[in-house]
Structure formats: C-alpha cells, structure tokens
C-alpha cells in the first residue's frame, strides 16, 4: 500500500473551503491507512507552510521529489494539468480530486493546451468527485472517463457547527453573509435591505475569520445570505444551516443536492429583487411568528447526517481499497 499525498496550494493562508476539505481528507486517511503508510499534505509553493486559520492534525511532505514505488498523489482539479505533467515524468500514479466541476478547464497561461488538460484526466487512475453536480459535470466534459469517477463524501464538523435549544434561544436579530463572492450583487442587496429592515435587525459581514470565529457568528445569526458562484459544494451554506440559520440565496449549482425547504430558499443568480423580497418576507415572518426551534431541528439533524464524519470515513475507506490496486 502506497502513502497518499495530497498536493495543495497555500491560497495565501486565507479561509478556503477546498483547502479545508483536503486537510480533512488527509487527517482522516492518516487514521484509516494500514501501518507503514501515511497520508500527507504537500504544499508545493512552500514546503514549510501550513494553514493556521483552522485546527488540524496532519502530516506534511517536506521534500519535492516523489517516490513512484511508495507514493500515490492526488491533485485538485484547478492545478491538475501542471502537476500531472510532472508526475507523469516521474512515473508517479495519481488521481484528480475535482472540488469544483467548473474548474476542470483551468490551466496555466503559458505552455499548456486544452489537449494537456485532456491528457491529465486520461492518465489519471481515477477522478474523485464530492458532489452530484461535480459528477455530472465530469461526465458531460469527459463522458469517456465516467468509469473513472469515484464518489467521496465530505463532512462538516458537528462539534463546531451545531445548534442546541440554548443556542437557538439566544440568537440575535442578525443576518450574515460572506462578501467574497458576487460582491456587486451583495452591495446592491444590502442597500435595499437596509432601507426596509426593522431597526432591531442588523447585517454582518463574515470575512477573513478563523473557523471557530465563523461558527460562533453563525450561532448568533438567524438568516444567512448565500452569494455562491459556480461551485462544487460550497461549505458556508451548510455550516450556517447547521448553526440554525435560514439560508436564502444562490445555490452555486452544487448546493442543489441539499437546498431543501424549510431551511434553504433558492434565488436564481442575479435576481436581486426576488432575493430582497424573500429576505424581507422572512424577517417579517420571524417578527410576527417568532423563531421556533422545533421547526428547524429535524431538518438540521438530517443535514448533519448527510455530511457526517462517519459517511466521509466510509467513502475514504473505499478510496483506500481503490489505491491498493495501484
């Protein structure tokens, strides 16, 4: 059995869902792999780097050369074409982890072609997908490689993102959102909302915070505004919902697999008027009828089960069995 190395960027140490998912996989795999094998993060830009905006217990690969007899590499899709070439030259077997099906086409600006993208996927031993939308995107782009697709689960840490009755009762009249996506849309919407919201309601931006700080704010807010762009499986809508928020906004397409009433309320991307009306109506509803814990709890529990650590571990155990063949 080979050690499993996840190639990972640093993203300038800013909170990024994809990187958190990669770290989580490595952490869980380290406890599932047989003795004598490891799972590690390889930060190719700086081998001494490690993320510090969320807690983790992962091992890091410090040398930049791969041992084809002992190591199997997994590359995120947005840098697959570049690293696939290097690994092919070293005869290192690899898989591609597609975290966002809309990034399959990504390649460095110089010296790479669309044919290189195709070759990267053709020579991959498997293609990992963590969402229904991603799986369908891979099939659409590369129908000839559909047998290579391996579905893996991701989890949201229920020790951090949860909502008890006590938390629910202490919630504030607070609306949260993340400003990194669809900035122009959010600015327009916030201006409209600030014209209509009751004076006892506030809107708070959630940005550049640690994972724990984000979870604590989500536990205080009642509504989360989703400005997801084209995404594989955006974590913030799930995390906020698990903390007892009513989520209104864009699914990012990948979110459609969990975007169900009564917790989630979809708005088509760019439909600002409908977005504003849904938020105002929900605030009016909460003001009139209150914010009732029992209305949310069964759906929160169902969402927590869908993205549980147990399901993620099970899918990673299956992944280990796949890699044993290589």
Predicted segments with their positions:
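N-terminal pre-catalytic "stem/leader" segment of glycosyltransferase-like enzymes
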Residues: 1-72, 235, 253-255, 267-269, ...
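Conserved catalytic-core segment of nucleotide-activated headgroup transferases in glycan assembly
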Residues: 18-21, 134-141, 151-212
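Extended catalytic core of nucleotide-activated donor transferases of GT-like folds
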Residues: 46-123
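A short, active-site helix/loop in glycosyltransferases that binds the activated sugar's phosphate group
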Residues: 82-84, 124-146, 188
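Aromatic "clamp/platform" in nucleotide-sugar-dependent glycosyltransferases that forms part
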Residues: 229
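Short hydrophobic beta-strand element within catalytic cores of glycosyltransferases
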Residues: 246-249
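A charged, aromatic-enriched C-terminal amphipathic alpha-helix characteristic of glycosyltransferases
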Residues: 270-277, 287-325
């Amino acid at each position: 059995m080979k050690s499993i190395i996840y190639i990972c960027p640093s993203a300038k140490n800013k909170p990024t869902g994809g990187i958190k998912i990669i770290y989580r996989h490595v952490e869980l795999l380290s406890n599932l792999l047989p003795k004598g094998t490891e799972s590690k993060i390889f930060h190719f830009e700086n081998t001494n780097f490690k993320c510090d905006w969320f807690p983790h217990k992962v091992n890091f690969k410090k040398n930049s050369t791969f041992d084809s007899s002992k190591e199997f590499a997994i590359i995120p899709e947005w840098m697959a074409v570049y690293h696939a070439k290097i690994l092919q030259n070293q005869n290192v077997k690899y898989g591609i982890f597609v975290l966002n099906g809309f990034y399959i086409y990504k390649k460095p600006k110089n010296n790479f072609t669309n044919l290189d993208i195709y070759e990267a996927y053709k020579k991959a031993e498997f293609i990992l997908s963590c969402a229904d939308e991603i799986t369908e995107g891979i099939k659409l782009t590369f129908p000839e490689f559909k047998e290579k697709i391996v579905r893996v689960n991701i989890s949201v840490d229920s020790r951090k993102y949860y909502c008890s009755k006590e938390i629910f009762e202490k919630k504030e009249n607070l609306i949260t959102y993340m400003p990194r996506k669809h900035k122009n849309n959010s600015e327009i919407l916030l201006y409209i909302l600030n014209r209509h919201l009751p004076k006892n309601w506030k809107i708070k931006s959630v940005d550049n915070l640690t994972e724990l700080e984000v979870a604590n704010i989500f536990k205080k807010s009642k509504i989360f505004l989703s400005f997801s762009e084209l995404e594989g499986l955006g974590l913030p809508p799930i995390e906020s919902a698990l903390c007892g928020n009513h989520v209104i906004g864009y699914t990012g397409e990948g979110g459609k697999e969990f975007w169900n009433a009564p917790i989630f309320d979809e708005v088509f991307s760019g439909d600002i008027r409908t977005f504003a009306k849904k938020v105002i109506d929900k605030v009016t509803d909460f003001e009139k009828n209150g914010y009732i814990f029992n209305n949310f709890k069964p759906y929160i529990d169902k969402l927590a089960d869908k993205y549980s650590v147990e399901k993620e571990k099970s899918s990673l155990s299956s992944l280990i069995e796949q890699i044993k063949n290589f």
